[in-house]
């Protein structure tokens, strides 16, 4: 079977809010009832019923503005996919913390950090603008 490509130099039907009147009608090949309805269209529109007017509209347009403006439910898929990947990442991180990484080194203990800070103060590290400049050596406390 041969696939026939569409000739884009010819007018095409497009449903867009910024282009409300397409160049051609939505339905190109009319059935017998649609042809009869198109003949009735030439008469007074007051003689047509509401269903006939809607059918005429559907021949010309695929969607109304209300249908075009209706929101899609795609956001639910996007949020669901994002939550899935966030949850999967959390599971990987928990697995890594339990099985891959060892315990924290002793240098992260509060006691160790306090001893290291005291050692830096005793060595008077960066006495002009740094840590030692904020320490009162006479009172043995932080300056206020």
Swiss-Prot record:
Protein name, as recorded: Cytochrome c oxidase subunit 4 isoform 1, mitochondrial
Gene that this sequence comes from: COX4I1
Positions bearing N6-succinyllysine: 4, 35
Entry keyword annotation includes Membrane: yes
Gene3D superfamilies linked: Cytochrome c oxidase subunit IV
Cellular localization per UniProt: Mitochondrion inner membrane
CDD domains: Cyt_c_Oxidase_IV
Residues with the N6-acetyllysine modification: 4, 28, 35, 42
Organism, scientific name: Hylobates agilis
Quaternary context: Component of the cytochrome c oxidase (complex IV, CIV), a multisubunit enzyme composed of 14 subunits. The complex is composed of a catalytic core of 3 subunits MT-CO1, MT-CO2 and MT-CO3, encoded in the mitochondrial DNA, and 11 supernumerary subunits COX4I, COX5A, COX5B, COX6A, COX6B, COX6C, COX7A, COX7B, COX7C, COX8 and NDUFA4, which are encoded in the nuclear genome.
Gene Ontology cellular component annotations, sorted alphabetically: mitochondrial inner membrane; respiratory chain complex IV
